[in-house]
């Protein structure tokens, strides 16, 4: 009987996961905007969070976020939840947002005062 070593399986690095997450977000952002625009009674909040969370989870696991509209642009607000260690990956993620997303969305890290 021969034994084989299996190679360790590494997850993709954060840069690659960030690219994948933005690609996924780009595919659903029109739908997110339509939901935000038409959901006047705020009945579809869970659906919004689920769709957006599924797109972002490739890069950002367990990250809190908010979605909204400020009167001019849609907003995705990523929260470091008071943890400095979460701040730097979120800022990197924010800076990698594609132009196609930034046409319609402001991407923020933390609450803007």
Where are the regions a protein language model picked out?
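Long, contiguous binding/interaction regions
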Residues: 2-66, 70, 81-113
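Short cationic amphipathic helices and targeting signals
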Residues: 74-80
């Amino acid at each position: 009987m021969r034994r084989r070593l299996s190679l360790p399986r590494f997850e993709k690095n954060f840069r690659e996961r960030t690219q994948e997450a933005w690609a996924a977000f780009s595919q659903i952002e029109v739908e997110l905007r339509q939901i935000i625009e038409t959901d006047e009674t705020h009945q579809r909040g869970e659906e919004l969070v689920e769709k957006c969370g599924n797109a972002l989870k490739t890069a950002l696991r367990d990250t809190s976020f908010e979605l909204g509209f400020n009167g001019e642009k849609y907003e995705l607000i990523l929260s470091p939840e008071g943890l400095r260690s979460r701040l730097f990956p979120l800022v990197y993620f924010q800076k990698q947002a594609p132009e196609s997303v930034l046409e319609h969305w402001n991407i923020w890290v933390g609450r803007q005062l």
